[in-house]
Amino acid sequence: MADSLSKAERSERMSRVRHRDTKPEMLVRRIVHRLGFRYRLHDRRLPGTPDLVFKSRRMAIFVHGCFWHRHPDPSCKLARMPKSQLDFWRPKLEGNRERDLRLQSELDAIGWKYLVVWECELGHREQLENKLLAFLTEGDSR
């Protein structure tokens, strides 16, 4: 199927796609802040440029969209493979997943812990808060 937009129009439209400060990321940031934790954003020195960074704890949080990052949970309805243009989408989305796994391994190698928050988890606010709190207090002797 041919694209209805010119290459320049498509480029302009795609350049406006937000990579930071998305609604899911903002929600996680508000929850973490309300739990009493302070963080830095998007530290480019770390593999994968995590969304939230807790430098003194050597911890990072990624907020992933289920579709783009291929949420492996089979019950996630947001991670379904598109039905058309599979020759484009399959390598694109599988490449994203492989990159994420590689970057997570790099974080492990330098001694950082990380948590991935999936877009579909945002609807279960209390469970998400508990998950974030458990991750961020892991190893605390308080």
Residue ranges and their predicted role:
Residues 1-142:
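Nucleic-acid endo/exonuclease domains
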